[in-house]
């Protein structure tokens, strides 16, 4: 496709999406299905107007997916409602840790015993497919800072945290393949990748979020009443936190999410203390002011990346192994890991059941795959993991995209 054709395609999609927002909101399918259909139509599966090669363009796709995930994590973090309590966060933390590890193990076992992959590749594939996606799962996430729905809160928190908690397993898989130094008996992996990278990321994010919240509050309410550009502040916070984490070998995804959470929570606390009788939303806050712009960027990145996904697939990309892996992940690995991981958390069984199904895979999985390729994954293995991951993500868009709205509507009617 020429640049003019790309401008026409993206421009037309933006116009249609903008004009049919209400219609699509009421329809039983998600916007990602529409974008995927367009990508499949113009890609090699149908009209063959373009083909996006994820192996040759792995560096570009890594950068695009990285930015998309960062924006989505920030948007999710600043929508976290209420004050932080351990009881409220217990289930999401268990989903992002215990359930994550169980999913990686189950997928790795399937990959080794059924797909005949080496152990390192199996663990890597499990880490790629285990995280739920913050970009494509917006329909099951918190809609605004005042949304108190427990299911949405749980799924949003999980997606915010598990894009960082999956990284140690990615590095473990690369290490077992000889592409990363795990240290003697895995000591470096435990100390650096598991402990330091996780704790350091959370600390960096929380400190940065609190600092920006207090600085913005002080400047806005000082004697000179400074006008702040909230969009720039939000993007700046993402950039500084992520860049600092890359420099000190901490997980930047985790840090950005917790920076956004800390920013939102601190601003709310300052507002309640200084102006306890103010109406919610009446005070200018960095977290709220930057949210609308980030959500628009999130929608745009979703459109572009899902179209590219459709442009990667050929008709012969659909193998029994890839379809079987998808069904195993959706029907066995995710439900089992959620039910076992949240055992004893106090979360109602209905919410655990829906969380077990709403494990949307998407842009985050593509990022981890491209990250592994950029770290020296052998080409034959890279091609095999590309084919498996693309089919899993595509099936997730189709299966979850057609079931999420009807199931959520049924859940709310019975609540």
Predicted features along the sequence, with ranges:
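Transmembrane helical cores of multi-pass secondary ion antiporters/exchangers
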Residues: 1-415
């Amino acid at each position: 496709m020429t640049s003019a054709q790309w401008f026409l395609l993206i421009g037309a999609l933006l116009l249609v999406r903008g004009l049919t927002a209400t219609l699509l909101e009421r329809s039983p399918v998600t916007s990602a299905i529409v974008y995927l259909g367009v990508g499949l139509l113009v890609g090699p599966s149908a009209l063959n107007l373009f083909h996006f090669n994820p192996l040759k363009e792995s560096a570009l796709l890594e950068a695009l997916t990285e930015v998309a995930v960062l924006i989505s994590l920030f948007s999710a973090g600043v929508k976290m409602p209420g004050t932080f309590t351990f009881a409220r966060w217990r289930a999401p933390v268990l989903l992002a840790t215990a359930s994550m590890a169980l999913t990686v193990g189950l997928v790795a076992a399937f990959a080794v015993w059924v797909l005949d992959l080496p152990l390192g590749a199996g663990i890597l594939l499990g880490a790629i497919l285990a995280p739920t996606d913050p970009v494509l799962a917006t329909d099951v996430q918190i809609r605004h800072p005042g949304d108190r729905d427990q299911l949405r809160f749980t799924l949003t928190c999980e997606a915010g945290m598990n894009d960082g908690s999956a990284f140690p397993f990615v590095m473990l898989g690369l290490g077992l393949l000889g592409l990363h130094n795990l240290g003697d008996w895995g000591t470096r992996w435990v100390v650096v990748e598991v402990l330091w990278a996780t704790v350091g990321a959370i600390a960096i994010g929380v400190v940065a979020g609190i600092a920006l919240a207090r600085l913005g509050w002080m400047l806005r309410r000082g004697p000179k009443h400074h006008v702040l550009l909230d969009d720039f502040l939000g993007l700046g916070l993402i950039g500084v936190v992520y860049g600092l984490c890359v420099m000190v070998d901490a997980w930047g995804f985790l840090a950005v999410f917790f920076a956004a959470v800390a920013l939102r929570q601190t601003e709310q606390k300052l507002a309640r203390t200084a102006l306890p009788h103010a109406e919610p939303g009446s005070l200018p806050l960095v977290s709220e002011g930057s949210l609308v712009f980030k959500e628009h960027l999130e929608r745009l990145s979703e459109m572009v990346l899902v179209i590219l996904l459709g442009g990667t697939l050929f008709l012969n990309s659909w193998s029994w192994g890839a379809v079987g892996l998808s069904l195993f992940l959706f029907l066995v690995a995710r439900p089992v890991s959620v039910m076992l991981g949240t055992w004893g958390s106090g979360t109602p069984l209905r919410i655990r059941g829906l969380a077990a199904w709403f494990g949307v895979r998407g842009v985050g999985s593509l990022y981890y795959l491209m990250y592994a390729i950029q770290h020296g994954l052998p080409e034959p293995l890279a091609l095999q993991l590309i084919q498996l991951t693309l089919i899993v993500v595509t099936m997730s868009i189709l299966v979850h995209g057609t079931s999420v709205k009807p199931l959520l509507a049924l859940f709310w009617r019975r609540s």
